[in-house]
């Protein structure tokens, strides 16, 4: 005859929800204190000002900084320019990513797909500054690689400026658009494409009516990355932008002498991204991601 001894079960075993809370306590504390805390400090500082005589912070509520941004033509044009660059980068990244991701997911053989994914990821392993300075060498107005290649045709490269920023940022963030679309295309059943062809739909009609609705959440996910990363970038504009500046450059040049104004400028990309995420959430584009 055998006897069994009851194993005592602790409080955490009887209440798994408390075990889950214990596991999440540390990362949630980090998120609240470091991430949300820094955002709160940023928003709070944006409503302060600086004494013109002493240069000290004046901790009184004011909208002066935001009024200066949206009433000063130079700052307002910088806001419009930054948003335009982010939109163009997202658009060009999408145009390049769609055929590339489609080839990787639907045309290339399964044995080559891991290699193609690795090739897309390879630029992310290189230093950000190395990649930007490489594009600086290519975009040089006189001795750059692009100008050297176009000279026999009587053309010249874009040089430094608006176009250089868009081209460089598109290269930097392209993998963030390719990978979500590739993941979405791998989930596309072959039976749906076959059914569309059997019903007499052309390739373009199949792409518009079958493929696009399925990969649209993936496109939105990729656009969140490319749009938000472009909005907050300032190093690329500093290296290949010439005289063109973005919001990040304004923050960089003003935070030492006027921290509240720099904080107000820094809140603009944050608010724009939050509004974009809210619109995406309300549209339900990410529900099936």
What do these predicted ranges mean?
Residues 1-44, 113-116:
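N-terminal signal-anchor/first transmembrane alpha helix
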Residues 3, 36-73, 138, 142-143, ...:
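Short membrane-interfacial helix/loop motifs at transmembrane-helix boundaries
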Residues 4-9, 14-19, 51, 63-74, ...:
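Interhelical loop and adjacent transmembrane-helix boundary motif
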Residues 10-13, 130-170, 204, 241-242:
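Membrane-interfacial helix termini and adjacent extracytoplasmic/periplasmic loops
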Residues 11-12, 88-121, 191-193, 278-285:
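Transmembrane-helix boundary motif in ABC transporter permease subunits
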Residues 25-37, 122, 171, 177-190, ...:
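Transmembrane alpha-helices
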Residues 42-51, 130-132, 176-180, 218-252:
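Non-cytoplasmic
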Residues 47-87, 109, 155, 253-259:
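Periplasmic/extracellular loop-to-transmembrane helix junction in inner-membrane transport proteins
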